[in-house]
């Protein structure tokens, strides 16, 4: 039989007030409250699905989307500058994953329970956004091949043919035959190949300059090769012209044994007619 204890109204009121005071002391500011909302271990991935932003942030890095309740939430979307600032302290993709609080989309599918598949070829693609602070954060989104952004902050069904992972400027289409094509190893390879990374633009420019120098060298070599053959053709043509010039020079003298004008002799010689040959014993 439970023990019954009578408590007066004054004691109950005093108890409630003391409890509220303790709670207020534990939360010193709105920032602390916001931080306590997001300081959750990465193991509890599902807890991030219901995170919403109440205030409308400013800046171009935000997009208005409609939530399940029909209301509009303003969700920050990362851009290239944000990604660069985010990756700046890290030297590799693996180090970024290890030290950052970001949760990548479940696209490696190491565990069969991570995804579901039906005959239509649709897979469940869970995305877990994390708010580092209020009105800012990292959002991985799906992007269709047509370039339309599809922002997701929870388990969402998407067609495999549209499944692409966009990070910085990289778009890799996932293949149904090899669902692990977009994996951490793949992203690490892209990092190593200077496709993604914090100093992406600088490395791209250096690679572009190197390719330009190589192309110019190849074009220069080709120009020299073609120049040699062109000069050879010109030399041969000049030799033929010199022979013709010397041959027709003799027709300029006054003692023309056959009485032809120079122009006629040249024409008949070049025409190669029997008449010309008869009048040109040389």
Swiss-Prot record:
<feature type="compositionally biased region" description="Basic and acidic residues">
    <location>
        <begin position="10"/>
        <end position="19"/>
    </location>
</feature>
<feature type="compositionally biased region" description="Polar residues">
    <location>
        <begin position="26"/>
        <end position="38"/>
    </location>
</feature>
<feature type="region of interest" description="Disordered">
    <location>
        <begin position="1"/>
        <end position="45"/>
    </location>
</feature>
<feature type="compositionally biased region" description="Basic and acidic residues">
    <location>
        <begin position="201"/>
        <end position="237"/>
    </location>
</feature>
<feature type="region of interest" description="Disordered">
    <location>
        <begin position="201"/>
        <end position="259"/>
    </location>
</feature>
<protein>
    <recommendedName>
        <fullName>Uncharacterized protein ORF56</fullName>
    </recommendedName>
</protein>
């Amino acid at each position: 039989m439970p023990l019954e204890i009578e408590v007066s109204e004054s004691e109950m009121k005093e108890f409630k007030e003391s409890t509220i005071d303790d709670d207020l002391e534990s939360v010193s500011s709105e920032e602390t409250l916001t931080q306590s909302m997001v300081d959750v271990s990465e193991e509890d991935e599902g807890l991030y699905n219901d995170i919403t932003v109440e205030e409308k942030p400013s800046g171009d890095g935000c997009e208005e989307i409609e939530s399940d309740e029909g209301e509009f939430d303003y969700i920050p979307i990362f851009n290239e500058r944000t990604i660069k600032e985010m990756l700046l302290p890290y030297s590799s993709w693996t180090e970024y994953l290890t030290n950052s609080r970001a949760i990548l989309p479940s696209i490696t599918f190491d565990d069969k329970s991570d995804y579901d598949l039906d005959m239509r070829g649709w897979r469940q693609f869970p995305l877990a956004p994390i708010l580092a602070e209020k009105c800012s954060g990292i959002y991985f989104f799906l992007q269709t091949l047509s370039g339309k952004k599809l922002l997701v902050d929870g388990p969402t069904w998407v067609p495999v043919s549209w499944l692409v992972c966009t990070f910085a400027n990289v778009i890799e289409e996932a293949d149904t035959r090899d669902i692990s094509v977009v994996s951490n190893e793949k992203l690490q390879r892209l990092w190593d190949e200077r496709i993604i990374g914090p100093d992406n633009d600088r490395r791209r420019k250096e690679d572009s300059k190197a390719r330009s120098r190589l192309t110019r060298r190849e074009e220069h070599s080709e120009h020299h090769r073609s120049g040699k053959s062109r000069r050879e053709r010109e030399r041969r043509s000049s030799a033929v012209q010199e022979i013709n010039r010397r041959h027709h020079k003799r027709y300029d003298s006054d003692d023309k044994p056959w009485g032809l004008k120079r122009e006629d002799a040249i024409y008949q010689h070049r025409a190669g007619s029997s008449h010309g040959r008869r009048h040109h014993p040389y």
